[in-house]
Amino acid sequence: MKQVQDAYIVAATRTPIGRSGRGFFRNTRPDELLVAAIKSAMLQVPTLDPKAIEDAIIGCSFPEGEQGINIARIATGLAFANPVGGVTVNRFCASGVTAIQMAADRIRVGEADVMIAGGAESMSMVPMGGNKPSFNPEVFARDENVGIAYGMGLTAEKVATQWKVSREDQDA
């Protein structure tokens, strides 16, 4: 039986944060931003042969429109001469970190040696809720499901209250 091995992050990069709908990147496709991030990460590891990359896992909260049709596969197809497989993961605000965790797990259990993982999102191209929100009303018919509708702001307030973290402590 193969032993669980360690997984390492050998390069990390990100694009600058823009303002939704009116920022510098408002007309830049999210797959193009992702390609720039991937290429920047590759520059940090010049000895890594792109052919060694086995798969890409990219998190995306709203994988539709300009960030649809499997943004992981599209971006790696644009970034590399040789095709790299890809899968897009949706866990809303935790999509990117979930993608990284999934890639690390594949390495840890010996399913892969080299992975690309991260997140991509353009709130200018695909707004909150997607281009055509159509929420199932049955989800909100039960009181215990109300948390599904919480945004990160409300979630942060509840966590801060639960753990008694004041605004002043957060800003310090």
Whereabouts are the PLM-identified features?
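Redox-cofactor binding/interface segments in oxidoreductases and associated redox assembly factors
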Residues: 11, 58, 117
